[in-house]
Amino acid sequence: MNTDEIYAKIPHGKDDKPFLLFEPNKVMEYDIYDVDGPFAMTNKELVGCNVVLPFSKPMRTDIAGIATVNGKSVPVVVAMSQIWNMDIWWAGIKFGGALREYGQKATVTVSGFVDTDGNEMIPAQFTVHTAEKVKAKKEDIVHEKVALNAAEEGIVLLKNENGTLPLSVDETLNVFGKGQHEFRFCAIGAGKTNPRYNVSFLEAAEHSRFMLNSELSEFYACGEDTLPPEELVTKAKEKSDKAIMLISRSMGEGFDATSRKGEFYATDEEDALLKFLRKNFAKVIVILNTGYPIGTEFLEGADAILYTGFGGMLAGQAIVNVLNGTVNPSGKLPDTWAKRYEDIPSSKNFYNAVEGKPRIGTDCGEIWLDTVYEEGIYVGYRYFQTFGKEVGFPFGFGLSYTNFSIRAKGISYDGKSLHFTAEVANTGKVAGKETVQIYLKKPNGKIEKPVRELVDFEKTRLLSPKEMQTFSFSVPNSSMTSYDEETSSYVMEKGIYEVFVGSSVAAEKAGEFRLTADKTVQTVKPVMRPIEEIKELSQKDEKGTYPTGARSGVKEGITYL
């Protein structure tokens, strides 16, 4: 039986009351760590919905319904997405912290929603059961060590004023924000992982030497970034003068993120909560559990900031290990964090579903969405460094609980490669790791070039205080070329090549070498040339070439190339 035949058997006439489709006598199994559920990739409105059930009829999205878990109200949304070539209306239920215990049964009710014919739904009631806890196995220990190490080394310490971190091991953790109950381990869609088990931040904290303020965490089980009552704040301050705010963002295939509040920008509630914490606590620590950069202006008052990304199955344990100092953070940013979305030149051309513009996903029908890359080569740090624009956090950036010195020696060029050594010394008081980053500034010539390009990097082993590690670098010509569109060749133009060595894109100059004649390294066959000429951003005329976005967007009447 196909989907059309199934739908034909469901009462959906004008006077028929809508209802949710589910097996009434079957207990639904629910994974407490599947924060975004199975259908978030079909409609962004379903992000954070743990259980998603289809309605029998098209529903109104402007009339709020009610969902409860064991009598306690939880957020619920109605959203439509196209699946199996059908428009399906869903009820997406956000359990948040209302269901976070293993092996727990709960009664869920949904009521009050109205269909497009004006009929109120038949109230629904069903039972969910959270999955049982999966225990670690001896034979998996080696694999889990790899998973934990990857999560730990990927955490980036973005800010640490006056040694706010690490915390003492007997600290009480006052965790604010709904993000603690929406902790994400992976992306959605093809980026989703299915490990044997997961360890969230709250679970790891509960099983650590830290004391978790459980009353505060229970307050945020409501699924909202609400300001806590005065009594709860007073109790929290008695336990610790530090506050932790956990912010989580979903990401994955199906739809691009936007600059909306709650995606790139902070929500009004997040902004208000962070300001409230700064006013009421001596130290504020922000944990960013996001899969992409977000606007940084609202973070400026935080004393410490950890960017965790999506750390996989043991992400929560990795964060606890960094907070208590068992692990010294050593991650580096793989992208530039702009203060504002509008600071990014590609924002002029990239489709941004704001100000009433609809989201456009992979299954939104026959729509031609054109994106003209007017920014040219100036993507990420290549733009911000070249044009001297202020950023929130630069490319390659990441702090440590210790300090390092990096010294480059013996820079030379033999016609085929750039050679030198770099000495990295731990000049601080605790063991840690550092990443040596090599950037090149190529000479100005016929070909447009940014003022910095990453050409190599290496990470140290764990260095004890006063310990040193030396690296030998050989950067081949193929990593130092620029592409000449006229000759379809990768070329090293003559002139001075400046070498920068350090711990981020803000590395200091370490030396230079001169090329007396142009050198063609490789010639290729030209493909994918633009049909129409694109005026690209150039240092020679920033104002006249800065992207406008005039040629990008939805093209009416066009559905194919």
Please place each PLM-identified region on the residue numbering.
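C-terminal non-catalytic regions of proteins with extracellular/luminal or membrane-system context
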Residues: 1-21, 31, 66, 72, ...
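Short beta-strand segments of immunoglobulin-like
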Residues: 37-44, 408-413
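Acidic/polar residues at beta-strand termini and the immediately following turn/coil
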Residues: 45, 83-85, 115, 484-485
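A short beta-turn/strand-edge loop motif at beta-sheet boundaries
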Residues: 45, 57-63, 99-102, 427-433
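Contiguous beta-strand segments within globular domains
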Residues: 45-54, 415-421
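Surface-exposed coil/turn segments at beta-strand junctions on protein surfaces, enriched
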Residues: 46-48, 84-88, 99-103, 413-415, ...
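Short, surface-exposed alpha-helix to beta-strand junction/turn motifs within ectodomains of secreted
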Residues: 47-83, 111, 124, 128
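A generic structural motif
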Residues: 53, 88-96, 473
